Curated annotation (Swiss-Prot):
Protein name according to UniProt: Autophagy-related protein 18
Keywords: Autophagy, Membrane, Protein transport, Repeat, Transport, Vacuole, WD repeat
Places the protein is found: Preautophagosomal structure membrane; Vacuole membrane
Pfam families documented for this protein: PROPPIN
Length: 372
């Protein structure tokens, strides 16, 4: 999550790694890597502002994009081995890098109108794909070997393209919402896609790759800006944060009353030559039998199973630890908080620990850590 120092001048970027075991923080001076539990500083580098910092699970491979201040560039991607402090790759682009996603097979670099896909083993460029204008760099890459990447198909509607980054083929076109997409997330195994529109009132979850099952969740009735969405590692929960100050945790259950099942013909392989070569009409016609029903469901979407209250207006990211007993929250004003999560109870979660992301972790320092 790129926050650009708007809420704390010392925080430019915040994110978890793929399994939520580490926290990456970009600062005006460089970047830091923390272990999430126990909260400890793993690595720190001060070579200039970092606007994007992405890890590959808990490995030593880290991708960094500059903040654009001083001698750092938003058009330059550095991939470093932080264990040996050795640069692996240095790539320069014509336009600003908006997002970088990695799994064990691919590195995907997202610009406003292009996606570049690289083989992570040798950094060979496999494809450059033209996309519709995507000024926020919205996309999600599955961490697992399903290797799906999803991104908005248009700024004018809520359509989402699903692409296989191994075969470089478009797998599906999903009409998730009526208005444009504001947030996306994929589950660890790549079988679930969560979507939100710019209205931010309804969250949808689709079963991939064919979207033949879906769930709808009610975040609230008042429009909101969705800051982040993350699935739990086992895919049983979805955490959603917004500018309202309430972080919602929804339970994923396709046997519930808010679940829909549809029969859809599986689309055949489509051209890999970019979006301009994709037969949108063919994909849309194959899905026309069920898409209106997805969007205009007659039942009320489900409410959250649990929630967290934080100050409104501050961007945040929420994720569940592997055991689903702790919810972790990162905020743009430099806080890292841990909440007790009871799967048998739900409701409002209680704050257990609070840390400052700008201070050296020290459990004996009352300013750095508050254990409540």
């Amino acid at each position: 999550m790129n926050v650009g120092g708007k809420f704390n001048e010392g925080i430019l970027f915040l994110n978890f790694n793929q399994d939520f075991s580490c926290i990456a923080v970009g600062t005006p001076e460089g970047y830091k890597i923390f272990n999430s539990d126990p909260y400890t500083l793993y690595y720190s580098q001060s070579n200039g502002g970092a606007g994007l910092v992405e890890m590959l699970f808990s490995t030593s491979l880290v991708s960094i994009v500059g903040s654009g201040d001083g001698n750092t560039s938003q058009r330059r991607l550095l991939i470093n081995n932080i264990k040996n402090n050795i640069p692996i790759c240095d790539l320069n682009f014509v336009t600003a890098i908006l997002s970088v996603k990695m799994n064990r097979k691919r590195i995907v670099v997202i610009m406003e109108t292009k996606i570049h896909i690289y083989d992570i083993n040798n950094m060979k460029l496999l494809e450059t794909r033209e996309i519709a204008s995507n000024p926020k760099g919205l996309c999600a890459l599955s961490p697992s070997n399903t290797n799906y990447i999803v991104y908005p198909a248009s700024q004018n509607n809520g359509n989402i393209l699903v692409m296989d980054v191994l075969t470089l083929e478009t797998v599906n076109l999903i009409q998730a919402h009526k208005s444009q997409i504001s947030a996306l997330a994929l589950s660890q195994d790549g079988t679930l896609l969560a979507t939100a529109s710019d209205k931010g009132t309804v969250i949808r979850v689709f079963a991939l790759p064919y979207a033949n099952k879906s769930l709808s969740f009610r975040r609230g009735s008042i429009p909101a800006i969705i800051h982040s969405m993350t699935f739990s590692l086992d895919g049983r929960y979805l955490c959603v944060s917004s500018d309202t100050g309430t972080i919602h945790i929804f339970k994923i259950d396709f046997s519930s009353s808010n679940s829909s099942s549809f029969h859809q013909a599986q689309p055949s392989s489509s051209p890999s030559g970019g979006m301009m070569g994709l037969n949108f009409g063919g994909l849309t016609s194959k899905m026309s039998s069920y898409l209106p029903e997805v969007i205009s469901q007659v039942w009320e979407p489900s409410r959250d199973f649990a929630h967290i209250k934080i100050p409104p207006g501050i961007p945040s990211i929420c994720a569940l630890m592997q055991n689903n007993k702790t919810a972790m929250v990162l905020t743009a004003d430099s806080l890292y908080m841990q909440y007790n999560f009871d799967e048998s109870v739900g409701g409002e979660l209680k704050l257990a620990k609070e840390f400052s992301l700008l201070m050296e972790p020290d459990l004996d320092n009352d300013v750095t850590a508050k254990i409540l």
